[in-house]
């Protein structure tokens, strides 16, 4: 088996690694002396307050008789319990990821017409530049999906004529485009990985304008593009708790 010289670990590297390790040790006592919060945790394991936000909150304790006790976790977006939002999508027969994205970005739940227009806007942004899939995603595909996403997002910079414009309208435009494109970048990257590294058949389905984010993921992921309404609803529900993390990734 031949070794790529670009990736070869030589004896010199082994020696230098040991030198680097020896000079990178810090006396644990110094953390206590200077009150350093390792891993943003107090010595008792409690998280350190480093900022304030009105966007989301996680409640994992309850006050009982003046003492904090562990409790089933509750996630809140802009003051709304995520469980209530999910229940509302079931009652009103709409998808929740787009609704939560609107809520997180603009601070309120959208009216039906606002949600329709917002979903339409995301759909219109769900188009990759010409030859992007062939030239960027399909060439030298990575085994690491997060690496694939990172490379794709960084490369989109080269296709953006206003990449360095930090005005609020332009940054919002970039955020909405990335939110719209993440199903394509992630699934196409996965298809390239499966084809080049696992020998699977390669297929690329274009997104459908009438589909939600969850529906498009299933549509472009499956060879026959088939999925059930229940599968789409379950995936949409799974996307809701990670929508804030996804939003933070674009900040």
Located regions from the model:
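Beta-strand-enriched accessory nucleic-acid recognition/scaffold domains that flank the catalytic cores
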Residues: 2-23, 165-172
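Proline-rich low-complexity regions
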Residues: 110, 129, 182-183, 249
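Conserved small/polar residues in nucleotide/adenosyl-binding loops
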Residues: 245-251
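Glycine-rich, mobile lid/loop segments that gate access to catalytic sites or pores
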Residues: 136-244
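An N-terminal structural lobe/cap that precedes and organizes the functional/catalytic core
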Residues: 11, 15-16, 21-132
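Phosphate-binding glycine-rich loops and adjacent basic patches that engage nucleotide phosphates
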Residues: 53-65, 76-87, 111-116, 139-147, ...
């Amino acid at each position: 088996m031949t070794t790529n010289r670009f990736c070869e670990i030589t004896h010199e590297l082994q020696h230098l690694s040991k030198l680097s390790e020896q000079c990178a040790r810090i006396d644990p006592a110094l953390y206590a002396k200077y009150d350093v919060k390792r891993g943003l945790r107090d010595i008792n394991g409690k998280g350190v307050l480093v900022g304030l936000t009105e966007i989301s909150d996680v409640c994992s304790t309850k006050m009982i008789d003046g003492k904090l006790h562990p409790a089933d976790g509750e996630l809140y977006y802009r003051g709304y319990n995520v469980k209530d939002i999910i229940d509302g999508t079931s009652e009103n027969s709409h998808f929740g990821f787009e609704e939560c994205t609107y809520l997180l970005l603009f601070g309120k739940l959208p009216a039906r017409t606002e949600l329709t227009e917002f979903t339409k806007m995301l759909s219109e942004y769900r188009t990759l530049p010409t030859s992007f899939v062939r030239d960027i995603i399909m060439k030298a595909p990575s085994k690491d999906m997060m690496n694939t996403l990172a490379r794709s997002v960084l490369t989109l910079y080269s296709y953006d004529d206003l990449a360095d414009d930090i005005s609020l309208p332009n940054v919002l435009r970039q955020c909405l485009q990335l939110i719209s494109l993440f199903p394509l970048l992630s699934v196409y990257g996965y298809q390239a990985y499966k084809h080049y590294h696992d020998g699977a058949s390669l297929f690329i389905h274009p997104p459908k304008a009438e589909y939600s984010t969850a529906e498009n993921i299933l549509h472009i992921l499956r060879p026959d593009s088939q999925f059930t309404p229940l599968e789409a609803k379950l995936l949409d529900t799974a996307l809701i708790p990670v929508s804030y993390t996804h939003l933070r990734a674009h900040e």
